Regions:
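N-terminal flexible segment immediately upstream of the FAD-binding catalytic core
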Residues: 1-56, 60, 70-104, 131, ...
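Short, conserved charged micro-motifs
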Residues: 3, 50-53, 114, 291-294, ...
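N-terminal glycine-rich flavin-associated loop
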Residues: 10, 33-65, 83, 87-132, ...
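C-terminal substrate-binding/cap subdomain adjacent to the FAD-binding core in PCMH-type
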Residues: 33, 141-143, 151-154, 161-385, ...
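Short, hydrophobic beta-strand segments
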Residues: 37-41, 279-284, 335-345, 399-409, ...
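Extended, hydrophobic alpha-helical segments in both membrane/secreted and soluble proteins
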Residues: 65-67, 74, 115, 282, ...
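Flexible helix-coil linker/hinge segments at domain or subdomain boundaries
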Residues: 363-373, 469-485, 515-518
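Ferredoxin-type iron-sulfur electron-transfer modules and their immediate structural context
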Residues: 475-479, 487, 492-496, 500-561
Length: 561
C-alpha cells in the first residue's frame, strides 16, 4: 500500500503537479469507455525528467503508469489503478517541421485538428481523421493506430509514423526509426535494454515456424485496419525476415501498442498534401443495410476519398437533436441506411463528373433509391451529422445505451455483406437491434448492441455478444479491432483472434520491452476481464435525486450518466 507520505515525497521530485485527492482520482477513473478504476494518483509531467522519476517510482513500488492524452479511447485504454500520466497539459509542442520533406515532429499532447490548422498554410495535413479530431491527441492516435473516415485514401496512423522518441521501462532515452537490416543487427549487439529489445525481436521473428504461425493466424493482409495485439506481422515485411522491404521500423510496432511498451515523448509524422479543393458527396439512400454493403463493394471501384454509412438508428437520433436536425436537409423518405461517397478533384466540374459516373453505376446495378449530390458548405453540415453520431448514441434517452464492445470489427470488403448478415443473426438471437455506422468503404462498421449495463442480465449479454462476434470475426479472418484498439473490452479475446502461440509471442515481446510491467498493465497481454470494473454498480436501486433543473426529457439526471 502506497501511503500519502510516499506520494508527497514523489511530488517533491517532480516539476509537474501530482494530485491524489478524491475529486481528481474520480475524474480520471474513466475514459470514453464503459470502464472505471480508481487510480492511485494523477500527474501532469512537465518534462522528460518527470517521466523518468515516475518510471523509477513505479518500478520500485510495483505499480503501473497509465499514459493518457485526451481520454477519448472507447475500449478502456486509459483506465487503471496506478498513476495516470496526463500529457495533455505540457507535452503540447511542435518540435520540428520540414516543409520540403513533408514531415513534422510533435509531442504527444498535440490535438489533431490544431496540428492541421498549423499545417494548412503550407498546403499539408495529417490524414487520419477520427470523429473526435477536435480534441483527440496524436499520442492517443498513435497508441490506438487510429484511422477515421479518410483511411481509404490516406491510410491509418501507423502508415504516417516515421519515428517515435520516448523512454523505455528503465528510464533510458530511445528513438525508434527506419533502419537497414544491417543497422538493426548492430542494435542487437548492444548490452542496453534497447539492445535486448532488438535482439528479442530478431530472435523471435527469424524463426520460420513463428513467421508461418503469424501469417496463418493474423487478420487477412487485405484488411488494412488491424489493431489486434502488437503488429508483429508488420515487421515481417522487412527483408531481415524474408520480406520485400529493405528497411525495418520498430515504430510501426509501437503504433497500436496502447502505451504498453514505451512512453512516447515525441512523434515524427509523414504528411500529405491537402485534398483537392473541390469535393462532391453522393448521399445514396438504401432500403436495407445489406443492399448498402453490396453497393459499397461496387462503389469502391471508383476513386473515393470517403465512404461512410449511417443507419436508421443514427438518423433517428438526429431527428430530435436541435443542433443536428437542421443538417438532415438531404434526407428523403425513411431510409434504413445512407452511404456518403466522397469524390474530389481540382475543379467542381470534374468532381461532379466523377459523382455522376458513380451514380450511373449504382443505378445500373439497382442500388439505392435516391442519390443527391452535395456540394459547397453543405458538405460540412453532412459530415457534422456523421461526426455527431457517436455523441448522440452516447446520449440515448434512458439507461439503455449503444455500447462499445464489438464496434471496431474489420473484415475484407468483399466479406462485409456476408459477415454483417451473420452478425445480424447473432443480434436477432438475443433480440437485439444493433446500430450500424461509419467506415463501410474500409470494411469496418461500428456495430453497437443497445444494452443497460446497470443490469446483470445485460452485462451477461455484453459478454455473450462480444464472445460470439469475436468468433465470427475470426471465421472471416478479420480484425476484432480496426481502429479503436483492444483496451480492456477486447484484449482478453486476443488469444482467440491470433491463436495461443502468437499470443504467447506477444507476451514475450511485452516482457522484453517492459520486464517489470511498468507501462499500462492489463492491456493487450494479461488482460483485465471485459465484464468487470464497469462504470456502474450492477442491479443497484437507483436513488431519486431532486434537481432544480428539469431533466424529465432524459428520465432524470442519473439516466444521463
Amino acid at each position: 500500500m502506497i501511503d500519502k507520505k510516499r506520494l508527497q515525497n514523489l511530488q517533491k521530485k517532480l516539476s509537474g503537479r501530482l494530485l491524489y485527492d478524491d475529486l481528481h482520482k474520480l475524474l480520471y477513473a474513466t475514459d470514453a469507455s464503459v470502464y472505471r478504476k480508481i487510480p492511485l494518483a494523477v500527474v501532469y509531467p512537465k518534462n522528460k525528467k518527470d517521466l523518468q522519476v515516475l518510471i523509477e517510482f513505479a518500478t520500485q513500488n510495483k505499480i503501473t503508469l497509465i499514459p493518457r492524452a485526451a481520454g477519448t479511447s472507447l475500449a478502456g485504454q486509459c483506465v487503471g489503478d496506478g498513476i495516470v500520466v496526463d500529457v495533455s497539459k505540457h507535452f503540447v509542442n511542435i518540435l520540428a517541421f520540414d516543409e520540403l520533406k513533408r514531415t513534422i515532429t510533435i509531442e504527444p499532447g498535440v490535438v489533431r485538428d490544431e496540428l492541421n490548422l498549423f499545417l494548412q498554410p503550407f498546403g499539408l495535413f495529417f490524414g487520419p481523421n477520427t470523429s473526435t479530431s477536435n480534441r483527440c491527441m496524436i499520442g492517443g492516435m498513435v497508441g490506438n493506430n487510429s484511422s477515421g473516415s479518410t483511411s481509404i485514401k490516406y491510410g491509418v496512423t501507423r502508415d504516417k509514423v516515421l519515428q517515435i522518441d520516448g523512454l523505455l521501462s528503465d528510464g533510458t532515452d530511445v528513438s525508434f526509426k527506419e533502419l537497414t537490416s544491417e543497422e538493426f543487427k548492430i542494435k542487437t549487439r548492444e548490452q542496453s535494454l534497447e539492445g535486448k529489445i532488438y535482439k528479442s525481436i530478431f530472435n523471435e521473428l527469424s524463426q520460420d515456424e513463428v513467421q508461418e504461425e503469424i501469417k496463418s493466424q493474423f487478420p487477412k493482409p487485405s484488411i488494412h485496419r488491424r489493431n489486434t495485439g502488437y503488429a508483429v506481422d508488420e515487421l515481417l515485411d522487412s527483408d531481415l525476415f524474408g520480406g520485400n522491404h529493405s528497411t525495418i521500423n520498430v515504430a510501426k510496432l509501437l503504433s497500436g501498442s496502447e502505451g504498453t511498451l514505451v512512453f512516447s515523448t515525441a512523434i515524427t509524422l509523414e504528411l500529405d498534401t491537402l485534398q483537392p479543393k473541390e469535393s462532391v458527396i453522393v448521399a445514396s439512400h438504401f432500403k436495407s443495410i445489406n443492399e448498402s454493403l453490396k453497393a459499397t463493394v461496387l462503389a469502391m471501384n471508383h476513386e473515393l476519398y470517403a465512404c461512410e454509412l449511417m443507419d436508421k438508428v443514427i438518423l433517428d437520433c438526429t431527428k430530435n437533436n436541435r443542433e443536428q436536425s437542421k443538417n438532415r436537409f438531404f434526407i428523403q423518405g425513411d431510409p434504413e441506411a445512407i452511404l456518403m461517397f466522397e469524390v474530389s478533384a481540382d475543379s467542381l466540374e470534374e468532381a461532379l463528373d466523377k459523382a455522376a459516373a458513380l451514380i450511373k453505376d449504382l443505378k445500373y446495378n439497382n442500388f439505392g433509391y435516391h442519390h443527391p449530390k452535395i456540394t459547397g458548405n453543405d458538405i460540412k453540415r453532412m459530415f457534422d451529422l456523421r461526426k455527431a453520431g457517436l455523441g448522440l448514441l452516447g446520449n440515448m434517452i434512458g439507461d439503455k445505451k449503444a455500447v462499445a464492445c464489438i464496434e471496431d470489427t474489420a473484415v475484407d470488403l468483399n466479406d462485409l455483406p456476408n459477415y454483417i448478415e451473420e452478425f445480424t443473426e447473432i443480434m436477432d438471437k438475443y433480440q437485439q437491434k444493433a446500430v450500424y455506422y461509419a467506415h463501410a468503404g474500409a470494411g469496418e462498421l461500428h456495430l453497437r448492441p443497445i444494452l443497460n449495463l446497470k443490469k446483470s442480465e445485460d452485462v451477461s449479454l455484453f459478454r455473450k455478444i462480444t464472445t460470439e462476434t469475436a468468433a465470427l470475426v475470426k471465421k472471416y479472418g478479420g480484425s476484432f479491432s480496426g481502429e479503436h484498439g483492444d483496451g480492456i473490452v477486447r484484449a482478453e479475446f486476443i488469444p482467440l483472434m491470433i491463436g495461443e502461440t502468437n499470443y504467447q509471442l506477444l507476451r514475450r515481446i511485452k516482457k522484453a520491452f517492459d520486464p517489470n510491467n511498468v507501462f499500462n498493465q492489463g492491456k493487450i497481454t494479461d488482460a483485465f476481464a471485459m465484464d468487470q470494473n464497469l462504470r456502474y454498480e450492477i442491479d443497484r436501486n437507483e436513488p431519486e435525486i431532486k434537481t432544480i433543473q428539469d431533466f424529465s426529457d432524459n428520465e432524470g439526471i442519473l439516466k444521463l450518466a
